[in-house]
């Protein structure tokens, strides 16, 4: 543990960013690839199945929101406590995290199953897509707890200095999912039900992978993939006595996790509203196009989020240790990496939108293909400055100031985007939905640049005050 802490305190910031980014990015790439391949196989079933999966997508994103509520909050608090050299408190946070996940998973499952049909109809399903969406979700509901224990705990693993474990856990689930998707759709012809079972099994295996590491502290087998050896031992151990809920710990976790939770929840709710508006103006095909957009969007968001995750332990540790110069440098490097990642994504979308549409819907009509290409180019036209909307709010979470992140996230998703989309869709119908996104990205980027400028000045002032105290 001391070695990991020393590197966070002393090593080159850029070197640390790359070290933590690469395994997180590889894990994210596999997850995104799974997402794309999963939609690819669903698209092979039918356009209705693709649209149905698109409706279910935002429900699954609600599950992710709850995983982030506890997981991101726990990861941030663990980073800060380790920076303060409070290892025992960090282990208590881990125990409380497991308990919170178990309670949330059971409650969420019960609430969702009470009236699934109504939820789906309000989410943009229609008579054509409801059977597909319902079949998919009835199976996926069993994956809530495994999803919490796999995806949710990756933030804690990163905070504990074991990002490769988080990477391999995601890879185990995603690769299993991809293989089973192919078998289910192309070999067994089980339709959307088969893809749902593939997702369930993948999440279960990933959860087992993570939980074994946390409980045993190491792995029973040696793993070497592309030069990445999984030889880490856990600096945090799951102990039964730490699983009893502690109000101060839960409060700390939820206060920081509230920002990504609200962001993801707002994104999910806005997505459900968007689906309903798209279905009203564009029917099943409109929802299918929206599903394609939502299949590619994580390529950008997960890449930039990998940057945000990579700097979280660096910023959290150094902020707790009052190394403000290193905090400032890490923030600027993260902003640059986020902009660069988004720029690569933008170039690809602008160059080959036709191929991106046909990948999911090869039977698309000429008119439908034209509409899909137009939608992609408009929707992602200002995606580069949009990367700031991930990096900067996550920075505030990492430094234990969730209130700023909550305000920023709600401003973007609810106040700006939802309002703009409703107005634009009334004026330009389906095109209005596509134009609402870049308009929101532009306005929000201006707001974030102001916040970034103010924060950099604060960090400079804190560093100067610290140096003055040392001189005395």
Residue ranges and their predicted role:
Residues 19-38, 139, 150, 173, ...:
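Transmembrane helical elements of multi-pass membrane transporters/channels
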Residues 24, 28, 40, 57, ...:
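Transmembrane alpha-helix boundary and packing residues in multipass membrane permease domains
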């Amino acid at each position: 543990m001391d070695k990991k802490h020393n590197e966070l305190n002393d090593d080159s910031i850029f070197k640390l960013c790359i070290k933590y980014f690469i395994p997180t990015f590889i894990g994210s790439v596999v997850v995104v690839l799974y997402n794309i391949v999963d939609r690819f196989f669903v698209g092979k079933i039918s356009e209705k199945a693709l649209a149905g999966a698109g409706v279910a997508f935002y429900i699954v994103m609600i599950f992710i929101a709850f995983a982030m509520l506890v997981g991101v909050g726990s990861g941030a608090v663990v980073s800060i406590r380790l920076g303060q050299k409070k290892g025992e408190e960090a282990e208590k946070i881990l125990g409380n995290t497991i308990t919170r996940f178990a309670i949330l998973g059971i409650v969420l499952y019960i609430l969702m199953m009470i009236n699934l049909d109504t939820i789906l109809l309000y989410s943009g399903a229609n008579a054509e897509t409801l059977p597909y969406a319902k079949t998919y979700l009835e199976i996926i509901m069993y994956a809530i707890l495994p999803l919490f224990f796999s995806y949710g705990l990756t933030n804690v693993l990163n905070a504990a200095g074991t990002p490769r474990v988080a990477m391999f856990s995601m890879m185990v689930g995603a690769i299993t999912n991809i293989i089973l998707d192919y078998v289910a759709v192309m070999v067994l012809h089980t339709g959307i039900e088969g893809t749902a079972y593939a997702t369930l099994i993948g999440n279960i295996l990933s959860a087992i992978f993570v939980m074994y590491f946390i409980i045993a502290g190491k792995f029973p087998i040696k793993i070497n993939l592309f030069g990445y050896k999984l030889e880490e031992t856990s600096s945090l151990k799951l102990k039964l006595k730490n699983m009893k809920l502690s109000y101060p710990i839960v409060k700390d976790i939820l206060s920081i996790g509230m920002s990504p939770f609200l962001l993801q929840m707002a994104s999910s709710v806005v997505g459900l509203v968007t689906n309903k508006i798209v279905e009203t103006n564009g029917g099943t095909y409109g929802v299918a196009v929206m599903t394609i957009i939502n299949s590619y969007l994580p390529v950008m968001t997960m890449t930039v989020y990998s940057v945000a995750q990579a700097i979280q332990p660096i910023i959290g540790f150094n902020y707790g240790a009052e190394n403000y110069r290193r905090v400032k440098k890490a923030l600027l490097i993260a902003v640059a990496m986020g902009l660069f990642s988004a720029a690569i994504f933008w170039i690809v979308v602008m160059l080959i939108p036709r191929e991106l549409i046909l990948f999911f819907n090869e039977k698309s009509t000429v008119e439908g293909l034209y509409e899909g290409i137009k939608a992609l180019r408009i929707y992602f036209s200002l995606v580069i400055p949009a990367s700031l909307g991930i990096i900067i709010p996550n920075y505030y979470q990492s430094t234990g100031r969730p209130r700023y992140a909550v305000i920023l996230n709600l401003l973007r998703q609810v106040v700006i985007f939802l309002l703009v989309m409703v107005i634009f869709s009334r004026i330009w119908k389906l095109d209005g939905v596509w134009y609402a996104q870049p308009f929101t990205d532009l306005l929000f980027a201006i707001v974030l640049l102001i916040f970034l400028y103010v924060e950099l000045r604060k960090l400079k002032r804190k560093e100067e005050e610290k140096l003055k105290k040392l001189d005395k």
